[in-house]
């Protein structure tokens, strides 16, 4: 039977989708890209914030229409199901099977029952049985599940449960296997990568893990995402600064800078410590790229709080920045707080931060013009006039790309090249191959 997949939400969810694809493939199902050709459609949902929930519902309803054609079975899994399974079963009867995260241990049994199959296999989700969907060069490497931070706005601890690290041996085994498949870049992910190892080793071991990953011969780039400011150690900064394979890129979701807002969010850092860690990273690693995520319109955020945040962004000049309007989530402490901010105010504050960041980003990219960067080529434009790639400054699907004029007869796909930047536009860079001295 033909099976099609849709993965919604974050990269951590994508890894689960890749594991589910691996389950079907190892049981001899045919994986198809076009949903119109699929007899089974599997949707792995996100349920983190309101916009993600709405996207998931819309996608489910859209795919349900295909049951009038080839699609015989519609399966929905993931975070949205974990949060609202009973409600979804009542509201969308077109779905044949809802699988929550807590049911993943028996996922294949559930699917066998639905399809009336008996493979006789004890099949479970397995990091080592993933089918990669991220192309030939890059793979996400998930090092843990769940979260212990309990920020008051966030439903993830309720959805995913407590933080559980994988053993370093298991992670390295997967990483070596990915390298054998031709993967050149590993992106280390978890809800909080800086907490890695704390639960099984009694101490955080992200720096040691990164060093071990750098020893894998065919891996050329290692980067990590989702590091919390209070857990960034001198050792981590030192390891990043001293290892050529580790991209000088810190993704630090600070959420806010006002002490009063951070306290209501139950964040473990205050404004001063956030400022200090950013200054320290930039001092120790001069060419570092720092990305952050902010929330505006959190309950009780005053005009003074927002002004402090705006001025902080203006002064700090983050290289990359994402901002969300606060989303009131069921069964979270923040949803019960008084002084909920009006929707229009949240949107206004979001627009102001984004307008400021667009200006900062444009100025930052213009400073790159004339410089030469190592670029990983991943695709081409339709006409083939440009190669498209990324520098160490760019995370897939989060940041920009580099367009490189294709003026060579060589096939540069899936290779690293040197590129001289000629111009910047919006969030992207344009350049030419740099061969001087070669």
Swiss-Prot record:
One of its GO terms (cellular component) is cytosol. It is an enzyme of class 2 (transferase). It is found in: Cytoplasm. SMART domains: Elp3. Signal peptide: none annotated. One of its GO terms (biological process) is tRNA modification. It holds the Pfam family TRAM_2. [4Fe-4S] cluster 1 binds at residues 10, 46, 79. Its main location: cytoplasm. Its EC number is 2.8.4.4. Its cofactor is [4Fe-4S] cluster. Belongs to the methylthiotransferase family. RimO subfamily. Catalyzes the methylthiolation of an aspartic acid residue of ribosomal protein uS12. This is Ribosomal protein uS12 methylthiotransferase RimO. It comes from Alkaliphilus oremlandii (strain OhILAs). The gene is rimO.
């Amino acid at each position: 039977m033909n099976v099609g997949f849709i993965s919604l939400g974050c990269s951590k969810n994508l890894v689960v989708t890749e594991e589910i694809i691996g389950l079907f493939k190892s049981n001899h199902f045919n994986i198809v890209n076009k949903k119109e050709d699929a007899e089974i459609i599997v949707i792995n949902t996100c349920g983190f914030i309101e916009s993600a929930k709405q996207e998931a519902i819309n996608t489910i309803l859209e795919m349900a229409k295909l049951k009038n054609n080839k699609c015989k079975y519609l399966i929905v899994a993931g975070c949205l199901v974990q949060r609202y399974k009973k409600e979804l079963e009542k509201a969308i009867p077109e779905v044949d099977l809802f699988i929550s995260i807590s049911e993943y241990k028996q996922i294949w049994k559930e699917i066998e029952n639905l399809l009336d199959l008996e493979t006789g296999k004890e099949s479970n989700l397995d990091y080592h049985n993933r089918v990669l969907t991220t192309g030939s060069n890059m793979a996400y490497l998930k090092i843990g599940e769940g979260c212990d931070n309990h920020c008051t706005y966030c439903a993830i601890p309720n959805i995913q449960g407590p933080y559980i690290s994988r053993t370093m041996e298991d992670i390295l085994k997967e990483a070596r296997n990915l390298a054998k498949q031709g993967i050149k870049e590993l992106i280390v992910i978890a809800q909080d990568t800086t907490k890695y190892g704390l639960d099984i080793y009694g101490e955080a071991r992200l720096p040691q893990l990164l060093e071990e990953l750098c020893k894998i011969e065919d891996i050329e780039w290692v980067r990590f995402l989702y590091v919390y400011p209070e857990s960034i150690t001198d050792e981590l900064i030192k390891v990043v600064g001293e290892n050529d394979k580790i991209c000088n890129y810190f993704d630090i979701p600070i959420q806010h800078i006002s002490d009063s807002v951070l306290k209501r969010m139950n964040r473990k850092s205050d404004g001063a410590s956030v400022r200090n860690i950013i200054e320290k990273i930039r001092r120790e690693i001069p060419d570092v790229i720092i990305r952050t995520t902010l929330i505006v319109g959190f309950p009780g955020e005053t005009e003074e709080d927002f002004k402090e945040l705006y001025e902080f962004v203006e002064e700090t000049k983050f290289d990359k920045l994402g901002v969300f309007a606060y989303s009131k989530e069921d069964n979270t402490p923040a949803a019960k707080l008084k002084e909920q901010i009006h929707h229009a105010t949240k949107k206004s504050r979001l627009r102001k931060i984004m307008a400021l960041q667009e200006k900062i980003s444009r100025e930052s990219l213009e400073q790159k013009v004339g410089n030469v960067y190592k670029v990983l080529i991943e695709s081409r434009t339709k006409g083939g006039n440009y190669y498209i790639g990324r520098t160490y400054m760019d995370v897939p699907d989060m940041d920009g790309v580099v367009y490189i004029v294709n003026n060579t007869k060589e096939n540069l796909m899936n290779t690293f090249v040197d590129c001289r930047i000629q111009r910047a536009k919006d969030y992207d860079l344009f350049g030419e191959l740099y061969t001087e001295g070669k």
